[in-house]
Every structure is written in structure tokens, then in C-alpha cells.
Amino acid sequence: MLYIANDAGHSVTQWQLGMYGTKSVYAGIPGRPGDNAAQLRSPEGLTFDKYGNLYIADCENNRIQMFCPNSLDGITIAGTGQMGNSSNEFYFPHDVAFDSELNLYVTDTYNNRIQKFARIQ
């Protein structure tokens, strides 16, 4: 599988690789930006955890959304949805990644920092 964040389309597409690769929308509503649980606004980086949950840097909503497998609604796990520079705020988060301990790292573009969020026990 290949997952592509479609910034202008406000969605994440899942491509099944193969001779006749098929695609489907995995998260967000194509062409419908928004800030509710099912919508994204300019998604950028994405990553999966070892449980199959998808984490998306929802850039213009200034939040990190987690989508569980087969779920249409995301859960905001970091960020407030507003621009800011406190410890749980972002100013255009661009990418997300996990380390081997499942700590989450977020590149926070216009705050010129990388934020680390400890694994939730």
C-alpha cells in the first residue's frame, strides 16, 4: 500500500499497488476542507504506528489527527486547532514521525522547532 497526503485535495489517498492499482480515500473528504473530525485542511506528513493507526500533520488546522483503521473520523491527539507557540500548539505542523519508543515527533514549521510528545501509556 502507498499513502499520499493530498494537500490541495484535503485528503489522504490509499493506493493498492499492483498491475491495476486501485485507490481509495483513507482520510478526509476530497475537495472539502474543514476542521471537524472527518475533515482535513492541507494535510502534509503522515506516518503509521505499529497498531495500524494513521497520524496526519493537519497543517492548516494546526493539529495532529489520528485515524484508527476503518474509521472515518479522526481524533486530535496534539494541537488545539489554533495557531500558537505553547507546548501543545503548532504554527503549520509539516511532518510526523515515531522513534523506537513510540514517542511522536512533529515538525512545527513557523515556530522553527520540532516537538516531542511522549508515548501515552
Regions found by a protein language model. Name each.
Residues 1-25:
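Solenoidal tandem-repeat scaffolds enriched in leucines and small polar residues
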Residues 10-13, 23, 62-65, 112-114:
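Structural signal for beta-propeller blades
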Residues 7, 17, 59, 69, ...:
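Short loop/turn segments immediately following the C-termini of beta-strands
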Residues 91-121:
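Blade-level signature of beta-propeller repeat domains, shared across WD40, Kelch, NHL, RCC1
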Residues 37-69:
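Loop/turn-rich, solvent-exposed surfaces of beta-rich toroidal or solenoidal domains
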